Every structure is written in structure tokens, then in C-alpha cells.
Amino acid sequence: MTLYVDSSALIKRYVAEDDSEDADAILLGDTEWVTGRHTFVEVHLAIHRRLGETERRVATTAFERDWQRTFVVALDDVVCRRAAELGIVTGARSLDALHLAAAERAGGRSVPIVTFDVRLGQAGRSLGFVVIGS
């Protein structure tokens, strides 16, 4: 099974938060992850902002390892235009709209979205996605 994984779900693997164990259970039970290119930036910045130097190195190494096994959707013109449309329709914020468009590109409504972001989850459900986590 393929899962679209947003930054809020991935971050929980490297930074101890509420639902970190749930995120691991969901993600480690699956063999294929897909996400948008912008997730790389979101996760790296979250690690940098929230962890000390030693923890940051460990988390960054773990994230880089996970990133190698993740299929990445390019944020090309088509995806960006679709994100703008989806943002208008759902009221989603910019990065959330990019996640929705990338998930759509990754396989449409047949690919569940794993997120712990309530607003992204609501927007995804309103578009007919199965949302896991929030």
C-alpha cells in the first residue's frame, strides 16, 4: 500500500511529540511513502528549530535515510497550478494546498494521506481523500 505522508507525520518520527508512536505505527507498517518536494524543507526546518545540536544530527541522519526510500512528487507547474485551485476550493493554506496537489498527482483519491495537521486533514476529506492520523 502507498501512503502520501505530509510533514506533520514525518516530523513525529524525529521529534518526540504527541502521537509520535501513532505516526511510527502507521508509517512503519507500510512499505511505500510518497510526498511533495516541499516536505524536505518543512521537515529539515522543524528539526533545526526544535532540537539541540546533538539531537539535530541524529534526527537529520534518520530523516535523510527515510527520504531515500520516499517517492518525491515534483512541484512542477501543473502541481502548483492545481495547488492554487485546491487552495481556493478548500481554503487550505499554501503548503497544505501543495500537499493536496502532490497527493492527487501521486495517485488521486486512492492514496490515503497521513497527516496530523487537522486543517490539512479536513481539506483532504472535503476532497474525498482518506485521511489517516488527524
Regions found by a protein language model. Give the residues of each.
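A generic structural signal for short hydrophobic patches within well-formed alpha-helices
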Residues: 10-11, 40, 120-121
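Active-site-proximal, substrate-binding regions of enzyme catalytic domains
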Residues: 42-71
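Active-site neighborhoods of divalent-metal-dependent phosphate/nucleic-acid chemistry enzymes
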Residues: 70-122
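Conserved N-terminal glycine/acidic-rich loop preference
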Residues: 73, 123-134
